[in-house]
Amino acid sequence: DHFQYGLGEIHISLNLDYLQINLLSEHHCPDSLQNLWILEKGGFDLDYVLECISYYKYTNYNKKLREKYLIRADKGIERLTYIIKDLDMITRLEAGDLSLNIETFDIIKLIESVFDLLEMKAAAKKIALSFDIDYKNPVLVKGDKERLQQVVSNLVVNSIKYGDINGTTEVSVENLIKNKVIVRITDNGEGIEKKHIPRLFERFYRVDKSGSRKEGGSGLGLAIVKHIIEAHNEKIIIQSELGKGSQFSFTLQKSEEIDS
C-alpha cells in the first residue's frame, strides 16, 4: 500500500515472504525524523513493529514463529495505516481543501446506521446503544452526510471505548432554535476531569498519559470531529463529570424538505 501526506510518503509492502516499510521524505533527514515523531506522538510504537520485523528475519527455520511475528507486525501496520489516513484527512480539513457535499437527509436514519455498524463493538463491552425516545418521524437536516456520519461514528466509538461494562450510550436529537437541532451523545462511562476538557480536540491528546494502545484508534478522532463540525459552521460542546460519564453535543441546520 502507498500513502501520501503533508510531510512525505510512506510505502508499505506485506506478504508471507517479506515485510518492508520505507519512509520517504521530501526534505531528507529532518522531515524523516519529524515523520517518526508524529507517529510516536500518535501512540504508534514504531519500535515494536521494527522489532517484529527483525525477529521475523531470523526465524526462517520456524514457520510458526515467523507467522507469529508477521501477525504482530501486521497489526502494527494496520494501526499505522489508520493513523496516516486520519492525518491526511485532518491536514486537508485544516487547509480547507476538503469540500463538503451539502444535502438534506434524515439524521435519525444516519444514527441508526451508525448503531448497526457499531453493534458488535458495543456488544463486546455489553454497552447498549439507544435513542432517548422512539423517533417516529424523520428529523431532516442539511450537511455533508458522509462526513457527519463520521462525526457520529467517532463520538459513539469514543463513548464505547471509555464506557463501562454493562453501560449505555444514548443519542438524542432536539430542536434548539427555529433553524437548528442539537444532537447529544451521552454515556455513563468513566467521565473526564475538567482540566482535560479544553484540550480534548487537540491532535493526539490523551487523558490517559500512558497513551494506552489496547483500545486502538489514531488519537485524531475528536480533532477530526471538531474540524468537520466547524466546516459546517456549527458548534460542538463537551460536558463531563469524572466517574459519571460524558456528553458530546453538536448543532446542525434544520431542513424542511428532502432535496429534489
Predicted regions mapped to residue ranges:
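Conserved micro-motifs of the catalytic ATP-binding
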Residues: Y61, L65, A95-L100, P138-G143
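Short alpha-helical segment of the dimerization/phosphotransfer core of two-component systems
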Residues: K75-L80
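A conserved beta-strand-to-alpha-helix junction within the catalytic ATP-binding
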Residues: N101-D116, S130
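Short conserved segments within the C-terminal catalytic ATPase subdomain
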Residues: K121-F131
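Short helix-loop "hinge" at the ATP-lid/N-box region of the Bergerat-fold HATPase_c
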Residues: S159-I160
